[in-house]
Amino acid sequence: MRFADVIGNADVAKALISMADSGRVAHAMLMYENEGCGALALALAYVQYLNCSSPVGGDSCGECPSCRQMAKLIHPDVHYVFPVNKGPKTTDDKPTSESYIKYWRELAVANPYFTEADLQRAIGIESKNGLIAVAEAKAIISKLSLTAVADGYKAVIFYLPEKMNQETANRLL
């Protein structure tokens, strides 16, 4: 997703672009929003901009290999974490975001302004509360310990980090 595709939040987008252009990229950022207002879209646009090999006019080019991978949410150095639970779309005993990544990609590519209820429907856990469990923290630590596949930044985008339990949060610290 390019900044040009983000609805609203122009001031925030401008600040993110300025930080990236000046080389002041924070090791962690928290984007807080009212549900469906665009924090995920901004995060996706920012990570795409950071990894774009040919940014143009304060936005990612949308054409380089990194941008094409980001458009499909398949960039090898960008990982996604979101609340999950056991459901009919996975056979994993301890599901992680990776268990449902196919459904996440479909949902986020179609509409990066989706809600928690949209996510629960997409991954088949409408009647359960999603959470980010310790197994997820272990998976993220493992992924981040690997060498980057491409040039640019490695990133983890957490959707609804407030769904992380205390043990998971402590593990990530």
Short names for language-model regions:
Residues R2-K163, E167:
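Clamp-loader machinery-focused feature within the broader ASCE/P-loop NTPase space
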